[in-house]
Amino acid sequence: MDSRLALATEEPIKKDSLKRYKILCAVLLALLVIVSLGLGLGLGLRKPEEHIGSCRKKCFDSSHRGLEGCRCDSGCTDRGDCCWDFEDTCVKSTQIWTCNSFRCGETRLEAALCSCADDCLQRKDCCTDYKAVCQGEVPWVTEACASSQEPQCPEGFDQPPVILFSMDGFRAEYLQTWSTLLPNINKLKTCGLHSKYMRAMYPTKTFPNHYTIVTGLYPESHGIIDNNMYDVYLNKNFSLSSVEKSNPAWWSGQPIWLTAMYQGLKAASYYWPGSDVAVNGSFPNIYRNYSNSVPYESRIATLLQWLDLPKAERPSFYTIYVEEPDSAGHKSGPVSAGVIKALQLVDDAFGMLMEGLKQRNLHNCVNIIVLADHGMDQTSCDRVEYMTDYFPEINFYMYQGPAPRIRTRNIPQDFFTFNSEEIVRDLSCRKSDQHFKPYLTPDLPKRLHYAKNVRIDKVHLMVDRQWLAYRNKGSSNCEGGTHGYNNEFKSMEAIFLAHGPSFKEKTVIEPFENIEVYNLLCDLLHIQPAPNNGSHGSLNHLLKAPFYQPSHAEELSKSAGCGFTTPLPKDSLNCSCLALQTSGQEEQVNQRLNLSGGEVSATEKTNLPFGRPRVIQKNKDHCLLYHREYVSGFGKAMKMPMWSSYTVPKPGDTSSLPPTVPDCLRADVRVDPSESQKCSFYLADQNIDHGFLYPPAIKGNNESQYDALITSNLVPMYKEFKKMWDYFHKVLLIKYAIERNGVNVVSGPIFDYNYDGHFDAPDEITNYVAGTDVPVPTHYFVVLTSCKNKTHTPDSCPGWLDVLPFVVPHRPTNVESCPENKAEDLWVEERFKAHIARVRDVELLTGLDFYQEKTQPVSEILQLKTYLPTFETII
């Protein structure tokens, strides 16, 4: 086609397009002008309305000055002539706890929850964010972390106030998972210090743990052993909904507010279990009767008002409590939108507190602790054990849930005669997939300290995580979440955070138990604590300048002599050794018991690397017995070792240990026959045999075995228990020595017949080997100590130690483990782990004190002693 023809035909098309384009542009331009004029007119019209018809600074003013065509008085709604901003400026401003652009400089509103008026700072009723919103100050949550060795307190505050803030059911994992949604709490975590978690006491319930936190006492000691309980001496029932909750007869111990008041300080509590009870006849100086209907903001605002009191009236110590995220966790479970919303709610409340403190220039003056009482775990109606599946008829009363107890229905008449043993027997080892273990309360793990109180019923069920135990189907709600479980479960771990001039900054600390908080609070207040179950000084590492410096316990019974005088015994004690046929052979092995001074020093260095245990019991006649492979502290009155200490190095090979030399026992020539056990003692008792505290074959050679095949190494053991004890030493001890590059072992008997967690007086021991005066232990302890830095061995450890202590019940059967038709490797280690303990628990049960010659500050030794190893990994 000719190019000119092509151009000719395209020209009309281009002209039409251009015409349409011009029309479209004109239309758009016109629309733009119209919109601009509309906006201009609208804004122009609005300006006089804002100036003439706005309620700003005129709320509830009946004079109508400066208003045309609308009103801002309280009757305008009924008349229908309110100004356009009346609702936002006048009504909503009385319903919120914050300032905004409408409120800044407002006329004072009498009904307002807080003020944003220009004189609010002077009148001390500002909303907590007044300075940030109305004066442009940087909010606390976004400002940089403060750092100062000295308190930054305003005039009138000679000592930093202490605030204890509890967020019920805030499990430690929440803070790890949702910290980005919690800016205020996360700021505290970043700038202050926090623990990986804080361990709650058992049962992990609200009232027992809150009262433990403020008394430093175990629930068995302070009396609030559960949220629901019966006291046979009072013949009354306690529950959170009953009037008995306010009866001081239930509440023992000295809560921190009373400790402070007794020493001249004032204390205030905006809720805390026990704070609205006349404990010991007294309330805190300022307190509120509990009501869950009071908004969190109101609680915070009131606490801030208490801080504004004149110096002579102002408290030094404050508690505040909020119900979330516990309530949401119960309703929806721990992994739920409801819990996230509740976490944000408590974060906002905490942020309000910190903004209020900053507004008073107290944010770097106050020592504040934020913690929880326990965690939360998921439950389901698919995970419930019903007692009707175990009994044809339920003729007992049961406290249901995650920490069940069983007692008689007929109270008080049958309380003490109820056959608890039969209930435990009928519930033991019934199913292969049974999700609880029944215990008589005295047999519960000693680390729980949950036995010595008449309110703790004698039958107890330890329930698997996320399971419940009920009487029968349909007896209670089972969906959602709950707590109360074994306090070693990770889901029961609680938060602990702290911030203030006394605390270290930007620090993460190892987990600890909440019984230690009371002593910490006393140190912050510079007062002396009442007697409690905590270990004072164990939390010194949280503080920049600790108020209290602990010291080692004083030894109350010195060791006497058990010297070597003759190589042949005065009395054979009915003992014999087939391997030693002549007196010359016996004399030769006995000479090994006569160590030189150099040999004593060598065995002390190897087998007592941290010093011998000190005896804190009074009038405990004992002597030290030295051997090349172990050292013993021999108790003369009980005719057995109180403790034995030895070190097991990491073995060069993993071959099994040789058998113990058979049919070989002899009298220890260093111990008087009247203070020794006879080998014939065990012939009459069909259920008890002799065991060895120090395992003779642990070193692998016969010569050293003879040093242990002596009467001073004998302890009475139930035959079933001995199977477990022997397996531990032959297999597990070697395993731990391999894993830890050697372990120092201290083991011994425990006597706790009154199950109070402390060593018994002689007249409290009630069971003896048949026909003898040899007492039968209630438990045996084993404390394994290694170097935390595993490149070092226990006897050459320059730094921190690691511990693995056990307190295992000494019982005639192993029914706790249901071992029938099971190999020992399937249940023995699990049994030992179930009875893990703290070194401090061992000390209380034995009257011994460990690690006195370890070159480390005593406060650091206390950290070691109060450490509880855990094996739980599932949240």
Curated annotation (Swiss-Prot):
<feature type="glycosylation site" description="N-linked (GlcNAc...) asparagine">
    <location>
        <position position="574"/>
    </location>
</feature>
<dbReference type="GO" id="GO:0005576">
    <property type="term" value="C:extracellular region"/>
</dbReference>
<dbReference type="GO" id="GO:0003676">
    <property type="term" value="F:nucleic acid binding"/>
</dbReference>
<feature type="glycosylation site" description="N-linked (GlcNAc...) asparagine">
    <location>
        <position position="533"/>
    </location>
</feature>
<keyword id="KW-0964">Secreted</keyword>
<dbReference type="InterPro" id="IPR017850">
    <property type="entry name" value="Alkaline_phosphatase_core_sf"/>
</dbReference>
<dbReference type="InterPro" id="IPR002591">
    <property type="entry name" value="Phosphodiest/P_Trfase"/>
</dbReference>
<dbReference type="GO" id="GO:0051150">
    <property type="term" value="P:regulation of smooth muscle cell differentiation"/>
</dbReference>
<keyword id="KW-1015">Disulfide bond</keyword>
<keyword id="KW-0106">Calcium</keyword>
<dbReference type="GO" id="GO:0004081">
    <property type="term" value="F:bis(5'-nucleosyl)-tetraphosphatase (asymmetrical) activity"/>
</dbReference>
<feature type="binding site">
    <location>
        <position position="374"/>
    </location>
    <ligand>
        <name>Zn(2+) 1</name>
    </ligand>
</feature>
<keyword id="KW-0812">Transmembrane</keyword>
<feature type="binding site">
    <location>
        <position position="290"/>
    </location>
    <ligand>
        <name>ATP</name>
    </ligand>
</feature>
<feature type="topological domain" description="Extracellular">
    <location>
        <begin position="31"/>
        <end position="875"/>
    </location>
</feature>
<dbReference type="GO" id="GO:0002276">
    <property type="term" value="P:basophil activation involved in immune response"/>
</dbReference>
<feature type="binding site">
    <location>
        <position position="756"/>
    </location>
    <ligand>
        <name>Ca(2+)</name>
    </ligand>
</feature>
<keyword id="KW-0735">Signal-anchor</keyword>
<feature type="disulfide bond">
    <location>
        <begin position="70"/>
        <end position="83"/>
    </location>
</feature>
<dbReference type="Pfam" id="PF01033">
    <property type="entry name" value="Somatomedin_B"/>
</dbReference>
<keyword id="KW-0378">Hydrolase</keyword>
<dbReference type="InterPro" id="IPR001212">
    <property type="entry name" value="Somatomedin_B_dom"/>
</dbReference>
<feature type="disulfide bond">
    <location>
        <begin position="145"/>
        <end position="191"/>
    </location>
</feature>
<feature type="disulfide bond">
    <location>
        <begin position="55"/>
        <end position="72"/>
    </location>
</feature>
<feature type="binding site">
    <location>
        <position position="276"/>
    </location>
    <ligand>
        <name>ATP</name>
    </ligand>
</feature>
<dbReference type="GO" id="GO:0008270">
    <property type="term" value="F:zinc ion binding"/>
</dbReference>
<dbReference type="GO" id="GO:0047693">
    <property type="term" value="F:ATP diphosphatase activity"/>
</dbReference>
<dbReference type="InterPro" id="IPR044929">
    <property type="entry name" value="DNA/RNA_non-sp_Endonuclease_sf"/>
</dbReference>
<dbReference type="GO" id="GO:0055062">
    <property type="term" value="P:phosphate ion homeostasis"/>
</dbReference>
<dbReference type="GO" id="GO:0006796">
    <property type="term" value="P:phosphate-containing compound metabolic process"/>
</dbReference>
<feature type="disulfide bond">
    <location>
        <begin position="381"/>
        <end position="478"/>
    </location>
</feature>
<dbReference type="GO" id="GO:0034432">
    <property type="term" value="F:bis(5'-adenosyl)-pentaphosphatase activity"/>
</dbReference>
<dbReference type="GO" id="GO:0004551">
    <property type="term" value="F:dinucleotide phosphatase activity"/>
</dbReference>
<dbReference type="Pfam" id="PF01663">
    <property type="entry name" value="Phosphodiest"/>
</dbReference>
<dbReference type="GO" id="GO:0047429">
    <property type="term" value="F:nucleoside triphosphate diphosphatase activity"/>
</dbReference>
<dbReference type="GO" id="GO:0009986">
    <property type="term" value="C:cell surface"/>
</dbReference>
<dbReference type="GO" id="GO:0009143">
    <property type="term" value="P:nucleoside triphosphate catabolic process"/>
</dbReference>
<feature type="disulfide bond">
    <location>
        <begin position="575"/>
        <end position="679"/>
    </location>
</feature>
<feature type="active site" description="Nucleophile">
    <location>
        <position position="206"/>
    </location>
</feature>
<dbReference type="GO" id="GO:0004528">
    <property type="term" value="F:phosphodiesterase I activity"/>
</dbReference>
<feature type="glycosylation site" description="N-linked (GlcNAc...) asparagine">
    <location>
        <position position="237"/>
    </location>
</feature>
<feature type="glycosylation site" description="N-linked (GlcNAc...) asparagine">
    <location>
        <position position="280"/>
    </location>
</feature>
